[in-house]
């Protein structure tokens, strides 16, 4: 929350064009401190374009941003980062053969000494890395081990802890669970809750409602560059979110159209079965989700 009780980050009427292609059209959303806003949509919905405008990679052609209640114009990623908007992309910007602590401070290396005798402060870097990861509930065996030896979920957690350490007020996570298995996705979701509990506004980009719903407080659904739905958690259950995301309504409508055209041919029946399978899958997957309660702190 801002000092006046409003959203930490607010986007109003953002549009972005690439020639004649409309990537975003009149998109509005907000992010509150200590909440997870889930930005959902299929491939090509406009999620990546929106986060690149939020993080300063692209400049919007229309609309405005308010950060902490003040109008902002992000001309570069550094502008956004200096205001406290940090983005963790899928590739994580890590070097696998470097140690965890070197990756943690990559680009912001701490030094000691002066003049020609200035050198990397290894002791501070290793101690800080271990301490910051511990605050997030991340237990690493050795800060000197190459970051490439960590699992995908552990590397994501290191990137999240790094952003938090360097003062992120808004943390944008670009599909952090997309390439992970069930167990490692659960690890990342737990650390997202940890960041939220530390008062950070989190934007969680995903195309998987089963990953978003357990941690989300607010859900914004994009479709073809426009906001298709905007709901608080208490307004929409997981089944409704899946229905909006997966096109269950479209499948059923198409089945009716085919039924009228082909007098109930096999294509219509197949589509109806697909819609029923989608509903059944909602229940079975929900049973495998990580716990929705607060994540354990550093002490377990």
Where are these regions (language model features)?
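Long, low-complexity, intrinsically disordered segments
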Residues: 285-300
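Glycine-rich phosphate-binding loops of nucleotide-dependent enzymes
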Residues: 2-281
